[in-house]
Amino acid sequence: TDRQGNKAATIEIADQPDTSFLDGKVTAEALKRLDKLSKSKQPFFLAVGYIKPHLPFSMPKKYWDIYRNKSFIRKEAEDKQPIHAPVISFHNWEELRGYTDIPKHGNLSIEKQEELCKAYYACVSFIDSQVGKLLGKLKELGLEKNTIIVIWGDNGFHLGEQHLWGKSTNFELDCKVPLLIYSPEYKDAPKRINDIVELIDIYPTLTDFCGLKPAHTLSGQSLRFLIENKVNWKNRAFSQFPRPYKAVNSYKNQTHMGYTVRTKNWRYTLWYDNATNHITDRELYCMNGNKAEKENLSGKREYVDIENELQQMIEEYKNTHNK
């Protein structure tokens, strides 16, 4: 796919009801299916997928109005690339380029940056409203008493941070996603769990809650044990993205693959040449407080032991999943 092809504007706003937009139509159909499923005595699984807040940022005007007068101007330091980060870590914002209101090269104006941030948040509010409608229908039908609900995203998104727009990097903002789980068997007040988990843990979690046995061995682990404080958790998560950027949708164009592991205190990324399997670039970032992903520390003598430990994690992951 040519992500710099002919596109319209990045932002589309219309004073129309939610159902005039695709995600609103998805919600309407999901509500109908819940009505139908509630009349059946059979267990059901319903997946509801939304496009927003992916580009283009399209939403009913009422959600845009929430952020119309808010300021999204950040400090200049927040938009700088990490010190000593290799060029391969970045891209030219291909996901954003090609829209009629975005230059093919160079930076965005402050006005356009702020407009894009407002539109992104407006799309998040649009989807928040759609999820609210689904939860309201479950309660209306009495299904919330025996339904497990999982809300998650497939990737993060840069809005100018680290001088990036879009996704498809191994940085924290692209790899970290929201994950909310509701199960009626837990009566206590909601809680936030700060342990590191992976999206591959969702399926074994659902089968566990439903009393089902997975059909085969899984890489993920049930989060039930973590929720109930019954296990020392793995506290590591892996992600990967290819280069060049255009290879995201075409494996034959890949020349390098970047593997990253996130632990409590560190993010470590190794870039491999696909032809030779040699490591071409390394990135080590402290993830604590204000230092998070500000400087690539790889190669510094004081971090040799940490790098060796994290590299072993990546090698084990790579060897296990690339067979």
Stretches with model-predicted labels:
Residues 155-161, 187, 200-203, 208-287, ...:
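C-terminal cap/loop subdomain of S1 sulfatases and analogous C-terminal strand-loop tails that border
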Residues 1-27, 33-42, 47-146, 150-196, ...:
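Active-site-proximal cap/lid insertion segments
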Residues 300-313:
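Compositionally biased, low-complexity linear motifs
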Residues 47, 310, 314-323:
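C-terminal helix-rich "cap/oligomerization" subdomain common to oxidoreductases
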Residues 293-297:
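Carboxylate-dense, calcium-coordinating segments in secreted/extracellular and ER-lumen proteins
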Residues 33-34, 135, 227, 314, ...:
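Hydrophobic residues within well-ordered, non-membrane alpha-helices that form the packing/core
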Residues 29, 62, 133, 201, ...:
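Alpha-helical elements of Rossmann-like donor-binding domains used by nucleotide-donor carbohydrate transfer enzymes
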